[in-house]
Amino acid sequence: MSLCTVEINLSTIKNNYLLLQDICKTSLVGAAVKANGYGLGAVQISKALIEENCRHFFVASSEEGVNLRNALGLDVNILVLNGVFEHDALELIEYNLTPVLNNLKQIEIWQKFSNLKNRLLSCYLHFNTGINRLGLSSDEIEQLINDRDLLKGLDLQYIISHLAISEEIDNPYNLEQLNRFKAYLQYFPNVKASLANSGGIFLGQDYHFDLARPGAALYGLNPLTKNPVTLKAPIIHLQNLTLDSHIGYNMTFTTKRDSVIATLPLGYADGFSRNFSNQGEVFINSRSVPIVGRVSMDLINIDVTDLPPSEIFLGQEAEIIGNYCTPDKIASIIGTIGYEVLTNLGSRYKRKYIG
């Protein structure tokens, strides 16, 4: 097991959830816990949020749904965003998982198994209003409007859609999607609706409908919510190098002075991108320390020359992610997003849950 530790503060995640619930007022707030809770632990996060009365959990696949159902029991709703396929339909039924149906083929499959089991099967419908990934097209929606028998045997619980650019509050595309969604919903007046992802919650009450589906904001990937994640790594090696010494593969860093270089036990095998080579920073006792040389599979080097000698020793912990270096801040260094930083947190890291 890695010497590095990811600490996840469940109290912070719960507080983020309560903030979002407060903004949504009377609308329900679920939680996106796909990709193992954005790399932080879907089971642990879901159990914590159940304590705050969260009852809707969104996963990507049936496999994720089964794992969550086994951990949580039957008293919650687990929604499978990728929908249903012939190979996993029986599994969804067995584990009481609700598929989000994204096209007419998935509706057909779910109807087939409704007939096979001779009972109503619950589902959500996903209407594509402009993100153009998953979701029923305008032509498919029109078919549903004109032929309600296409939904026979299905217990339609929610109609959902997904915003493409909700992080940009003033972008007119948000309103375009909202208006398309409302136009479709008028043909399904008795069905509950869900549109707001994390960013959508902050667009205002018009976007909240009956259920909001935050993911990123729960995990601190929003300016108004707090980061619950800390990643720390101990110094495992120290060396004194003279002027003009080369560091790491391909000698991409050369010392410009006599230097003290420390080595930390993480690398790209742990999801710490090679793009951080010779850029980025870690923190030791709140002080910024630069990464020097190439990020290798299991190791990175940092220049600790400017730290007080009393703070440089084997076992001293460096903070890679935390209050000084949030996932969003780290992501900006290499041109990605905080989501990727979190979901790339390696399986070798020890996970520690507090709060």
From Swiss-Prot:
One of its GO terms (biological process) is D-alanine biosynthetic process. It is an enzyme of class 5 (isomerase). The keyword Amino-acid biosynthesis does not apply. Keywords: Isomerase, Pyridoxal phosphate. Its EC number is 5.1.1.1. The modification N6-(pyridoxal phosphate)lysine is found at K34. It comes from the Bacteria. Pathway: Amino-acid biosynthesis; D-alanine biosynthesis; D-alanine from L-alanine: step 1/1. Catalyzes the interconversion of L-alanine and D-alanine. May also act on other amino acids. GO terms for cellular component: cytosol. The lineage of its organism: Bacteria, Pseudomonadati, Pseudomonadota, Alphaproteobacteria, Rickettsiales. This is Alanine racemase. Substrate binds at R133, M297. Gene3D superfamilies: Alanine racemase (3.20.20.10), Lyase, Ornithine Decarboxylase, Chain A, domain 1 (2.40.37.10). It catalyses: L-alanine = D-alanine. Belongs to the alanine racemase family. GO terms for molecular function: alanine racemase activity; pyridoxal phosphate binding. Its cofactor is pyridoxal 5'-phosphate. Pfam families: Ala_racemase_C, Ala_racemase_N. NCBIfam families: alr (TIGR00492), PRK00053.2-3 (NF000792).
